[in-house]
Amino acid sequence: MSYQTGMAPARAMEDDSDVEEEALVADYREQVQYSEGGMEEMDQATLAQQADEIQSRLVQASQPLDFQATLETKFASYDNYCALFHYILNSEGPVDLEPPTYYWAWDVIDEFIYQFNTFCTYRARIARQAGNEEEAQILRDNPNTWGCYSVLNVLYSLIQKSQITEQLAAMKRNEDPMAVAGPYGSKNLYRMLGYFSIIGLLRVHCLLGDFSLALKTLDDIELNKKAMFARVMAAHFTTYYYVGFSYMMMRRYADAIRMFSHILIYVSRTKNFQKNTQYDSITKKNDQMLALIAICVAFHPTRLDDTIHTALREKYGDQLLKLQRGGPDSLPVFEELFKSACPKFMSPIPPDFDKPEANIDPIDHHLSVFMEEVKTNMWSPTVKSYLRLYTTMDLKKLAGFLDVKPEELRSWLLVSKQRTKQLRWTENGLLEGEPVNVSDLDYALQGDLIHISEAKMGRKLVDWYIRNLSRTYA
């Protein structure tokens, strides 16, 4: 079983990719119907035949840890993961085991990173509070338990052992991936763990704040319906969330909106085919995605899909208006939405238990970085509202309207103009892209004279009617 079906070359996701979305929905519907039938019977038979200690560990590794788990239980869970991955990676030759279920590999990587994240958050909280000396001492004596290096080492080792990057590269060249898979990569267990470890690295690097490296990890994975992650709903959602958030923190707002919009539309179209437990867990994240879209739209005004636009107005209508108006009143709204929708950032190193005041909350750190960008663009809506009224305007006159010094306004105009030039992803690596002007308002400074031009795009009514008619009569 390969991770991407077919041998078609890479193709970029278009803005109005309704055909792509419908294909994803149809593909997911078939998978759900299949998994609810013979797949469950096959999984039960497999588990019944392989009920030994290792097989039990395989099943246990994908089970969520109780939210109220004690520190001892968290340590034991880490030891179990270490034993399992040591057996898989360091045995003499590839282990002859089949994954218990189709979704097992994703569940294991997902739970492994989740426990790592929650443990780091818990450890940082104990260090800041400095109230529970007994637990603080245990954590102080075990700095390598759930350490960042250990987790990254597991993920990179699974990728290297499975030769998954070589397999994906071969598939892009329309070659046989099994020719480069090696003895480990030819096994389902290693191939699936290696593949989802790439998605796991995207997540971990984003949680650590290295957004460029997070996107770089997906160089060998194509963001389309043929990708393996698109067949596992939770993996699909996670991938686009972290890619979109990384783009947002890199100020590539147009690309961030595309990623968030894609997955929200997909979720809305597949909700009738979701199993209740899976859908409930994903819909809890929908509000976060909408909050991030609201932030991105404030920086980069653009048209949204009708489904997203309606949901955004219903959930964040008042906040969106404040964001779009800009000014000091928008700052608390930006802060509120960011803190409610951002990942649970963590530090790559253990906290200092002896100096609690020296420990900085990673979320507060990234919030401060983000708010600096917000403050830079805070007056953008107001300035643009004046510029739209003129074709030429004196710099000092505009500074008088805004009650700022001319040189401060000049600096702001130069920074704002630079922000309108962004990379827009089309194909190949996610860090690559074509430079485009993402604003319909452009201007140039000639001494103290501002030359202004505005490009007004007419709405494509024909496309709008066709799209809505197809939805109505489908």
Swiss-Prot record:
Keywords: Cytoplasm, Initiation factor, Protein biosynthesis. Disulfide bonds: none annotated. The keyword Cytoplasm applies. Residues 255-449 form the PCI domain. It is found in: Cytoplasm. Belongs to the eIF-3 subunit L family. This is Eukaryotic translation initiation factor 3 subunit L. It comes from Chaetomium globosum (strain ATCC 6205 / CBS 148.51 / DSM 1962 / NBRC 6347 / NRRL 1970) (Soil fungus).
